[in-house]
Regions:
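N-terminal juxtamembrane/topogenic regions of multi-pass membrane proteins
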Residues: 1-85, 94-98, 256, 262, ...
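Membrane-interface, cytosolic juxtamembrane amphipathic helix immediately N-terminal to a transmembrane helix
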Residues: 2-15, 194-197, 209-234, 296, ...
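Short, surface-exposed loop/turn segments at secondary-structure junctions
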Residues: 42, 71, 95-103, 195-199, ...
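A structural signal for well-ordered alpha-helices, especially hydrophobic packing surfaces
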Residues: 89-92, 113-120, 124, 185, ...
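Long amphipathic alpha-helical segments that form oligomerization/scaffold cores
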Residues: 93-193
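Cytosol/matrix-facing amphipathic helices and coiled-coil assembly/linker segments
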Residues: 109, 176-188, 197-220
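Bilayer-spanning, highly hydrophobic alpha-helical transmembrane segments
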Residues: 231-250, 275, 279
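A hydrophobic, small-residue-rich beta->alpha segment in the mid-to-C-terminal subdomain
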Residues: 274-278, 289-302
Length: 336
């Protein structure tokens, strides 16, 4: 998540520069054909650019709205996880008759948060864009906590060796930890450390956590529909390719209104203006593409590592622990 005021124009230009190079070539070719080789027949009617540009605007706007909704939903689910975690800390402290049980339950919950965020960020999907050259280049300017330490090292802070060994052979470690929580609550109830009402409430809270886990896993595992993403790319690049052909004749007509060295050369203005207009569409498409997957480790991700750190500090304060970790610090105004 970007925590600065805004991205700078220099960052945007550097991030999109490879596409700018392509747009530049696409704009120069029709101008050279028109001006140097005299192929004036290649000029297309301006109405073609208007119609295609309008259609492209609608589909790009639709895509960006939908990808923003995915990020917003991810943020809302993690906000719910944080709120339910605070409640979990309170009932673990107050419901069991022996306070020692609270520490075990809370630390296992912190392990669940850790396993969940590693599952979301630790494994990529083929449709994710963080592996693109532009995103990989920008990735060097900020930190992804899940790439700096392994899950096993993080889990050692919260779990005994026996539980770590049990987790080692499981595929979905977050779900396994929820299963272990349910078993622990059942044992507390069997030992009469929980009354029926408290046992029921704790099981209900575990169900809430499982529901929230399923929601973020759905966002992770179900991409923005590929048919919409594909047609969006076709529209954007078709518009970028045709725009210079529609502009050359319009700029050539400006020769009648100028004098001196500009006479006969106004058509070359097609290149910068075509690149500028096309770049706006291509950049909007790239922004939407980079926002599709809020758990891939991109600069616009939901800051799940920071949310987990907030929850960890608060829950360990509930246990009156004093050796607390610090909040994560942003790097290059990005925090994840």
């Amino acid at each position: 998540m970007k925590v600065g005021k805004s991205y700078t124009l220099a960052e945007f230009l550097a991030w999109t520069r490879r596409k700018i190079y392509v747009l530049l070539v696409m704009a120069i070719i029709p101008v050279v054909l028109y001006k140097v080789f005299g192929q004036t027949w290649i000029a297309a009617p301006w109405s073609v650019a208007v119609l295609l540009g309008t259609a492209t605007s609608f589909i790009v706007g639709f895509k960006n709205a939908q990808t923003y909704n995915r990020t917003l939903e991810a943020q809302q689910v993690w906000t719910a996880i944080a709120g339910t975690s605070r409640y979990w800390g309170l009932i673990c402290r107050d419901f069991p008759t022996h306070r020692a049980s609270a520490k075990v339950l809370i630390h296992r919950h912190l392990a669940w948060l850790t396993a969940l965020r590693y599952q979301l960020r630790g494994s990529g999907r083929i449709w994710e864009t963080v592996s693109s050259r532009s995103n990989q280049e920008y990735l060097k300017t900020y930190s992804v906590p899940e790439k700096e330490t392994t899950l096993e090292v993080e889990l050692q802070k919260f779990l005994p060796e026996s539980e770590l060994q049990r987790l080692a052979s499981t595929r979905n470690k977050a779900s396994t930890l929820m299963s272990m929580q349910s078993e622990a609550i059942r044992e507390l109830y069997a030992r009469q450390e929980l009354v029926v009402l408290h046992h029921t409430e704790m099981q209900k809270t575990l169900k809430d956590f499982l529901d929230q886990q399923s929601k973020v896993e759905r966002i992770k595992n179900f991409p923005y529909p590929r048919q919409y993403a594909t047609i969006n790319t076709f529209f954007v690049w078709s518009f970028a390719a045709l725009l210079p052909f529609c502009m050359v004749r319009e700029f050539d007509r400006l020769n009648d209104a100028v004098s001196g060295v500009f006479v006969g050369n106004m058509v070359w203005l097609t290149v910068p203006f075509a690149v500028l207009v096309s770049w706006m569409y291509v950049s909007l498409d790239q922004v939407g593409e980079s926002s599709e997957n809020p758990f891939e480790g991109g600069a616009n991700d939901v800051p799940i590592a920071q949310i987990c750190r907030w929850v960890e500090i608060e829950l360990r304060e509930t246990l009156q622990e004093t050796d607390l970790p610090r909040l994560l610090s942003p790097r290059n105004q990005v925090i994840l």
